[in-house]
Structure formats: C-alpha cells, structure tokens
C-alpha cells in the first residue's frame, strides 16, 4: 500500500480518484464545519481535481453510505436536541418535518456530488472475489472498506479516505491519499 498525504500530493490529469464516504461527509455533510481543517483540505483537493480535469469516480455503495450516514447523523442531532434519546428512526423521526428537511438536503447534496464526479464506477460484483472479501472482514475492516479498496486496486485509482481502518487492509497496490 502506498500512502501519501495531501500536502505531498500533486493532482494530475492522468490520475483518477475515488472519495470515501467520510470525505464527502466532510465536504457536504451535517458535520461540515466541525472539523474545519479537514473540510478545507478535502474541499481544496476536490477543487484541484476538478481544475486539473482528473478523473473522479463514485460508486453506488458510496452514495448509499452517504445518504444513510447523513440521515442518521441528522437523526442523532434531532434526538439530542429534543431529548428523545430512545426515539426510533423509522417510526419517530421519519414522519417529522425535520426528517423531510434532512431528506431534501441530502438529495440536493447527492446531485452536487454526482455533478462533481466524472464517472460512475460500475460495481463489477459479478467479477469480484466475494469469498475473499468476506474472509477479509475483521475487527478493523468492514466489507464496504475492503470492497472499495479492491475496486481502487483493480482500477489503479487513488482512494481518498480519512478512515484509519483502511490501513489495516492487506494491500499491495492501493494508492491511499489522506490528510
């Protein structure tokens, strides 16, 4: 695994990138502003990628994770601000105007994310060694992390992530870009 830090990386038109869900959350999510330095650095990387016409790919898995995580963060904030610590996501939160607002926000953000990406990466589920992926799941790395690492390895793409678990995944050819 090749690990490079943002400060040492030069974006090139020849490079292709995949942003992990946590990167999109720093840039667009409801926690944006909480870690302003990371938000700024990853937003700058996004701008550089777009300015250099480098490839920026996204998968359906990342979009699904983004939508679900965004809405769960909003749910947690709603529970806390309303002191409804035992509230249920589906029966208590979904019928609320707050959920409707969060849903509207996340849909708009997904459109922004998709417009930033140059292509949608097919998942190639039919050609992946799923047994090997499942066998690789550990206390440090979940299925989604391993799956995205393998996809980036196969394509030779830079994987941009702020998830320290990624480094625990055995990899010979992954190009990991982080803050």
Predicted features and spans:
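Short, well-structured N-terminal submotif of metal-dependent ribonuclease cores
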Residues: 1-62, 69-88, 155
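Histidine- and aromatic-rich ligand-binding microenvironments
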Residues: 19-20, 58-59, 140-143, 163, ...
């Amino acid at each position: 695994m090749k690990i490079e830090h943002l400060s040492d990386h030069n974006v090139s038109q020849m490079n292709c990138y995949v942003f992990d869900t946590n990167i999109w959350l720093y840039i667009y999510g409801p926690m944006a502003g909480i870690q302003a330095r990371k938000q700024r650095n990853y937003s700058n990387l996004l701008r550089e990628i777009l300015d250099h016409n480098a490839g920026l790919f996204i998968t359906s898995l990342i979009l699904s994770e983004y939508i679900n995580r965004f809405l769960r963060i909003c749910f947690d904030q709603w529970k806390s601000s309303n002191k409804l610590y035992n509230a249920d996501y589906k029966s208590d939160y979904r019928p609320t105007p707050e959920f409707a607002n969060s849903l509207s926000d996340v849909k708009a953000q997904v459109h922004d994310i998709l417009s930033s990406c140059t292509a949608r990466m097919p998942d190639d589920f039919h050609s992946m060694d799923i047994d090997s992926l499942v066998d690789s799941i550990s206390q440090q790395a979940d299925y989604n992390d391993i799956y995205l690492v393998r996809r980036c390895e196969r394509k030779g793409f830079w994987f941009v992530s702020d998830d320290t678990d990624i480094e625990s995944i055995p990899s010979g050819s992954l190009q990991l870009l982080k803050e």
